[in-house]
């Protein structure tokens, strides 16, 4: 809340460095909200974790549309200082979860977690577990592909191919919708078909995304391609996160979750930063073809786990 006010103040004083610092700390705050999905998964039985995570991510639809609308509606609240009102609104919104968490009491038995005799595996031991590699690979490279292409989309559509900002905005809105709307059924599908099959389904939609990029770079092709991209991300990310929850022991959860998120969001950040560079050096079609590398890695990690599980002990 305070850093949102600081961001508003930096706009008011025209201090760009302070604005960057404020947004950096806003980003840190937003990173903590990603832990809510693990809290949701741990609040239910492990076989119900996929549905719990899906339900939580479904809220992203509301956030996507309300967030954009609120930002546009409040950006001119303070005349002559664009977006000061948006940041002040953000400061108020961040108080809502703070208020709810203030009254939250965890009544679960934490004796297992706090017991010093319980051995926590090292990072190398985590990596020796093929299921852990499958989970982290699915989530990380799902985010890499999605972020790599989504970040480049508005530049490719509006700057490179001269499509209107209105059409670009519609494509991105429906892409976000496709990222979260499948959450209505993803949890149930994982429970019915298993983690690996849902990961293969996510890969299938990523392949469809790449195929759409091979056609003429028209509005409708971007539109369909980005919808496939969103669905693929949903299947892969929720499957990977849900699988991770089943792997670690209670005393390992903080280490496993922290390490998972460090890898996933570091990979996403690098992919996002590289998007503009690659679009400038290559093309939209080439960027999509590059994503085949990440897809192959996901498939290999999943096939490896499936093979080892079927292999006689």
Per-region residue spans from a language model:
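C-terminal ends and interior cores of transmembrane alpha-helices
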Residues: 1-14, 205-217
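C-terminal membrane-cytosol helix-exit motif in multi-pass small-molecule transporters
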Residues: 91-112, 301-306
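Helix-to-loop junctions at the C-terminal end of transmembrane segments
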Residues: 182-195, 279
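Helix-loop-helix hairpin linking two adjacent transmembrane segments in secondary transporters
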Residues: 18, 55-102
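Juxtamembrane intracellular "pre-TM" segments in multi-pass secondary transporters
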Residues: 106-136
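Cytoplasmic helix-loop-helix junction between adjacent transmembrane helices
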Residues: 24-58
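A late C-terminal transmembrane helix in Major Facilitator Superfamily
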Residues: 251-281
